[in-house]
Amino acid sequence: MVNMNIIEIRSDKIYKKIMDAPINKKEDIYRYELMKPFEFKWKCMNVPIVARQKGGYDVIIASEMLGVLSPKDIDEKQKKNINVLSADKIWGTCKETIENSINAFIKEGYDLNIKDYKYSILLANPNSSYTILSDGYWGDGGIPGYIFLSLVPNEYTINRLPVLIAHECNHNIRFQFIEWNNNITLEEMMINEGLAENFATWMFGEEMLGPWVSRTDIETLNTYIKPI
């Protein structure tokens, strides 16, 4: 297979530093050690690592809006979750799944421009509507070369990581051929998500279909989706 470089940003180690840091240091550790490696991704989304003015829109506010746990909430109460993310097996599985997912396209003759793929696993805010809608796990792979996996760590969400990675890798491949546009239409979004979920279930089976496909109903629409 074509050489590729899978770069893991070990969030567990960074989260431990945040957990042990005083409250006035937590945001900078999160900003510069966990999010800075993904600066290009955030730039594509018009999100600055550092706000242009005090209290302004930045990577911390943006990630909180997307359902990621705020650095100010990373304290001793998150110790168990951080310990779950510390298992080397989880990171090894992630790397292997990224390689297998991308190689599936290379074997079909796709000539990919991106050779470096950077990823990390983030702690999701369990009270976020995004997290609730997604059964505690979700991802972001819309910018080629960068993948975020977000979850509330437990047996169910950890077991779902491979299928989530396959879904996000499909986005990573697709957007190497389609220019990213922040003004994406609902039609385009449905196509993107449908292709990604189809690929993920092709790799891991229909029983691994994500909740964003399998359990969307009128009550969910009115209670969670419309308020967002």
Give residue spans per PLM region.
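Short pre-active-site segment immediately N-terminal to the catalytic Zn-binding motif
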Residues: 149-164
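Post-HExxH zinc-binding segment in Zn-dependent metallohydrolases
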Residues: 6, 10, 14, 186-223
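Hydrophobic, aromatic-lined core segments that form the binding pocket/scaffold
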Residues: 141-146, 173, 195
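N-terminal low-structure segments adjacent to metalloprotease catalytic domains
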Residues: 1-90
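Conserved alpha-helical "signature site"
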Residues: 224-228
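Auxiliary, metal-adjacent structural segments of Zn-dependent hydrolase domains
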Residues: 82-143
